[in-house]
Amino acid sequence: MTAKYLPYFEDQKIKPFQNQSNSGQRILAVEAEHDLRQLTAEVLIDAGYQVDVAENGATAWSALQLSKYDLLITDQFMPKLSGVELLRKIYAANMTLPIIMATGFLPTWEFALHPCLQPVKMLLKPYSFQKLLGMVKNVLHTTGSAGVEIPLLCKSHIEHESAIKL
């Protein structure tokens, strides 16, 4: 039996999300769990974002090569290509989009210690949709369309080792 990390609701009443004008910002949401993937997409669409979904890192990588996104929200543990493996490919290709990684397994201290993962924002599962939307808004507001610069230490790490090692 596999564990499912669905978002939790902070109170009994489910509050509808206001459809705010988010200038059609495009988000790629990557989640292995079908129900969570669909719920996440619905919440983001209701908030005014354009959303594409992928069920694993390999599908996400294909989408990233074909389209431009303003934000990537990715799961960590997925079949075919994990979240960290997806980050390796993104950084090796010099893509600079902001990234939120949602996980219930990877401790945040591991991210803090690795220079390649410092631009990545962590969203620990289970999370509320309000927390997800708050983080999305914050990340998009602080980075805008410019994306996130890959840290210099990360660039040299990729050039010399071609990998992010955790």
Could you tell me what each predicted segment is?
Residues 1-26, 130-166:
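Non-catalytic signal-transmission and effector/linker regions of two-component phosphorelay proteins
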Residues 38-46:
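Charged docking surfaces used in two-component/phosphorelay signaling
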Residues 48-55, 63:
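Short hydrophobic/Thr-rich beta-strand motif most characteristic of the beta2 strand and flanking loop
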Residues 55-59, 82-85:
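Acidic catalytic/metal-coordinating carboxylates
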Residues 67-73:
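Active-site beta3 strand of CheY-like receiver
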Residues 78:
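Receiver (REC) domain active-site loop signature in two-component systems and cognate sites
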Residues 85, 106-124, 130-134:
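Alpha4 helix (beta4-alpha4-beta5 surface) of REC/receiver domains from two-component response regulators
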Residues 102-103:
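Hydrophobic/aromatic residues positioned on beta-strands within the core alpha/beta folds
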